[in-house]
């Protein structure tokens, strides 16, 4: 499906409420955790090809950090999802007030070339924990790593829930033309301004 259809399909899926329950979020985090472990060697080979990074450096700066992020989210997710009581204004007595965490909806994650695994998958962990759908756009400047991340995501998740889009500027422009509920971007100030301008239109 093209990018517009993909975002529309994710929004439709989000609107079903399927991503909201604790059990669903927990399962998806565990699936990502297992997929990352299963594909660790593939990612190491890809990063050797793109950056000449040794496996130990890949683990210390990339995959290991994402696995730690996953462990932390799996431990704390239930607490983060709880309603939190807050003070009630006197004018509203005798009612009670609560803050209830809610998902944004459909997220776009645009990652850079220099830490392409960590800065792609760590934001994805947050998107999943938050009960969102997500489109991940790995950097075209790390082609082997981008292909490996896309493979991991496609083999792990339904595209209506989590999808990967590969490509360069044309794909970035097509993604930014869509309406997303939140965008996680890591990169230069110049490109950040382009992302902010595109997001402001929605």
Pin down the residues of each PLM region.
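N-terminal Rossmann-like NAD(P)+-binding subdomain of aldehyde/semialdehyde dehydrogenases
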Residues: 1-98
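Alpha-helical elements of the RecA-like P-loop NTPase motor core of helicases
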Residues: 45, 118, 143-147, 173, ...
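A broad detector of the eukaryotic-type serine/threonine protein kinase catalytic domain
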Residues: 11-15, 48, 52, 56, ...
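Short alpha-helical
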Residues: 38, 42, 65, 115, ...
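Conserved small-residue-rich beta-alpha loop and adjacent elements
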Residues: 88-156, 185, 202
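Conserved NAD(P)+-binding/catalytic subdomain of aldehyde/semialdehyde dehydrogenases
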Residues: 106, 156-202
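Residue-level signal for inorganic ion chemistry
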Residues: 25, 70, 131, 162, ...
């Amino acid at each position: 499906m093209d990018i517009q259809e993909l975002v529309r399909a994710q929004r439709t899926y989000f609107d079903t409420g399927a991503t909201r329950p604790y059990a669903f979020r927990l399962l998806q985090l565990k699936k990502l955790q297992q997929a990352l472990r299963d594909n660790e060697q593939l990612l190491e080979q890809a990063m050797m090809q793109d950056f000449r990074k040794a496996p130990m450096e890949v683990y210390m700066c990339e995959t290991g950090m994402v696995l730690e992020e996953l462990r932390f989210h799996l431990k704390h997710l239930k607490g983060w999802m709880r309603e939190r009581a807050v003070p009630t204004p006197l004018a509203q007595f005798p009612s009670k007030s609560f803050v209830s965490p809610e998902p944004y909806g459909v997220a776009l994650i645009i990652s850079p070339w220099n830490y392409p695994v960590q800065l792609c998958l760590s934001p994805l962990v947050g998107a999943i924990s938050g009960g969102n759908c997500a489109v991940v756009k790995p950097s075209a400047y790390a082609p082997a790593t981008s292909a490996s991340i896309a493979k991991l995501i496609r083999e792990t998740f339904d595209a209506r829930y989590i999808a990967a889009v590969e490509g360069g500027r044309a794909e970035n422009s097509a993604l930014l033309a869509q309406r997303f509920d939140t965008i996680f971007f890591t990169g230069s100030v110049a490109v950040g301004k382009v992302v902010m301008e595109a997001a402001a239109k929605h």
